[in-house]
Amino acid sequence: SAASDVYKRQEEETPLADGNAMILSAMKQLGKTRFVTVGHVCIHAFGDCEDKYQRMSTKFMQIFWPGVYKDMQKMGQVLARSDLNWTLVRTCPGRDGKVKKVGQNCSISLDGSQFRPGYSREALAEFLYEAAADQQMYSRKMPIFYREG
């Protein structure tokens, strides 16, 4: 059927990873060195201990969105191979698929030992801005951005 071709095509394509690869290539040609991007918590980083929320979120991605899961894994690999100064901020929306209210306290976990789904858009934007402005902030790392509590 036509629907099966669409699903098959979606699983084979990796637009986010390919887009990041093109951006990294252009940055290298232009002499730019700092790249900050956002990915899903299902991207595994070296040293992750993966708590129950991270494991569940990864399993859901593998089962319900295998194409997106594949794209995220490739994105992590593209960045890890790059010699640029990058930071991949891993996130996960809340159970309802929406971000949480403004002013919610958020934190960072470098090893995945602490993680809760959901976060404030404003808090994420502020963190991304700070990470882009500070050349050394989480350089070549994949911090998990999560809500506290």
Where do the protein language model's features map onto the residues?
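Short, small-residue-biased leader/transition segments that mark boundaries at the very start
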Residues: 2-7
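NAD(P)-cofactor binding segment of oxidoreductase domains
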Residues: 8-35, 74
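Conserved beta-loop-beta element that borders a ligand/cofactor-binding pocket
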Residues: 76-97
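Catalytic helix-loop patch of NAD(P)-dependent Rossmann-fold dehydrogenases
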Residues: 53-82
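Conserved catalytic-site region of short-chain dehydrogenase/reductase
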Residues: 41-47, 94-98
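Mid/C-terminal beta-alpha module of Rossmann-like enzyme folds, strongest
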Residues: 32-35, 111-149
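Glycine/proline-rich active-site loop of Rossmann-fold NAD(P)-dependent oxidoreductases
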Residues: 82, 97-106, 131-140
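Conserved catalytic-site loops of classical short-chain dehydrogenases/reductases
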Residues: 33-39, 87
